[in-house]
Amino acid sequence: PIKSSAASDVYKRQPYIYVLILAVFFLFVDVLPEDTTDISLLVLLIIAVIYNLYSFVIVIVNAVQTARGKLTAGQAARMNLIIKGIQIPAYIMHFILGFIGLAMSVWGIGFLLWAVLIDLLTILLTGISSIGCSIRMRKERLVSLPGAIFMGIGCFIYCADVAIAIVYVVKARKKSPAK
């Protein structure tokens, strides 16, 4: 079994931390006087930026450590699949919010932009993490160099990233069958 790392814990919370921050914000926004609403929006934005920078640093550290050999190819492949699988409910939620924004015409542009930006941020973070897995798979000779490059790029494409994560797990299992 894979030991939980800071990076995988961040991924598990990533899609839902925004919902939590927004829920707390909307609970208290009506309580605040009108002149402080702008300040509270700024605080919300600062919290989101800090959290995303933290996530970005953790993702890069995780990718580098995986590429250097902290995890075996099998462990990296399983962690990659878990990370990609956990993002699926978030993608569905963002799609629904984007669709609601699209249905709202001009008034829904904010929903639509939010859904697109959060999806792009999420796929960027999970894709960067997958690069470490691609490198580890190549170093352990489980995939060819062109295959590692192709799959590394594919980890930044919606739906293809989950399929590639499954391929990584299957290839890692073929190398070391279950004991």
Roles of regions detected by a PLM:
Residues 56-79, 102-106:
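Membrane-helix interface/capping segments
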Residues 74-94, 149-157:
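Transmembrane alpha-helical segments of multi-pass membrane proteins
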Residues 93-110:
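Alpha-helical transmembrane segments and their membrane-interface junctions
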Residues 1-11:
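Single conserved hydrophobic/aromatic residue that forms the stacking wall/gate
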Residues 12-23, 37-52, 112-121:
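Alpha-helical transmembrane segments
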Residues 59-61, 120-140:
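Alpha-helical transmembrane segments in multipass membrane proteins, preferentially the mid-helix core
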Residues 127, 150-170:
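Hydrophobic, aromatic-rich membrane-embedded alpha-helical segments
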